[in-house]
C-alpha cells in the first residue's frame, strides 16, 4: 500500500491506526474523502516531529499514492489521537529546508483556514494567532533555536485547532 512516508510519521500512524480497527479499509485508497469508518483508530499518542501538519489535533491526513503519483486527503473523525505530546525538542534534528517547508505548511493552514467561507470569530482567532507566531518564530526555528522551535510547535498546533473546525482551501488539494 501507499502510505504518506514522505510526510509526518503522525499521518502514517493515523492511517495505520484506522486500518487496524477497520480492516475493510485495508486498501488505504478507500479512505479518500470523508472516510465512512465505524470504529475509532487504535489508541494513539501523537508526538509530532515536524511543525507543520497539526495531525495530532485534526481529523485530516494526507496519503501519498506513489503508484498513481498523487496525494489525497482523508477526513475521519475516528482518527484523532487520544494524546498529543508537543515537544519542540523532537523537531531539533530537522534540516533547515524541511523546517522551512513545514513552517510554510503551517502558514498555509493558517491562511487557508482564515480565508475559507466557513471561518468564524473563534477560528479567526486561532488562525491570526498562528500567523503571528509563525511570523515571529519561523526564522528562529530554521536556525534551530529553542525559542523558534517552541514558537513553531505552538503555531502549527493553534493553526490545526482552527482549520480542524473549518477545513482548508484548494491549495491543500493540489
PLM segments and residue spans:
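Short, small-residue-biased leader/transition segments that mark boundaries at the very start
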Residues: 1-8
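Short beta-strand segments
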Residues: 6, 45-48, 85-87, 108
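Glycine-rich, small/polar surface segments that engage phosphate groups of diverse ligands
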Residues: 7, 15-16, 156
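Short, well-ordered, mixed-charge alpha-helical segments that flank or form enzyme active sites
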Residues: 10-12, 37, 41, 51-57, ...
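A glycine- and small-aliphatic-rich helix-loop capping segment at beta-alpha/alpha-beta transitions
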Residues: 15-32, 59-69
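Short, acidic/small-residue loops that bind anionic groups at enzyme active sites
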Residues: 22-49, 78
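Carboxylate- and glycine-rich phosphate/diphosphate-binding segment that chelates Mg2+/Mn2+
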Residues: 60-166
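C-terminal catalytic subdomain
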Residues: 166-174
Amino acid at each position: 500500500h501507499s502510505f504518506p512516508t514522505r510526510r509526518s510519521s503522525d499521518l502514517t500512524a493515523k492511517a495505520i491506526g484506522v486500518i487496524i480497527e477497520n480492516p475493510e479499509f485495508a486498501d488505504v485508497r478507500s479512505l479518500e474523502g470523508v472516510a465512512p469508518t465505524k470504529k475509532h483508530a487504535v489508541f494513539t499518542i501523537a508526538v509530532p516531529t515536524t511543525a507543520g501538519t497539526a495531525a495530532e489535533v485534526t481529523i485530516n491526513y494526507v496519503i501519498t499514492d506513489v503508484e498513481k503519483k498523487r496525494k489525497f486527503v482523508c477526513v475521519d473523525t475516528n482518527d484523532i489521537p487520544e494524546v498529543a505530546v508537543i515537544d519542540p525538542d523532537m523537531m531539533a534534528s530537522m534540516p533547515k529546508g524541511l523546517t522551512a517547508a513545514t513552517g510554510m505548511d503551517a502558514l498555509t493552514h493558517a491562511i487557508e483556514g482564515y480565508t475559507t467561507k466557513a471561518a468564524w470569530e473563534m477560528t479567526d482567532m486561532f488562525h491570526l494567532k498562528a500567523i503571528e507566531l509563525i511570523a515571529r518564530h519561523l526564522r528562529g526555528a530554521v536556525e534551530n533555536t529553542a525559542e523558534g522551535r517552541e514558537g513553531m510547535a505552538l503555531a502549527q498546533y493553534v493553526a490545526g485547532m482552527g482549520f480542524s473546525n473549518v477545513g482548508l482551501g484548494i491549495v491543500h488539494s493540489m
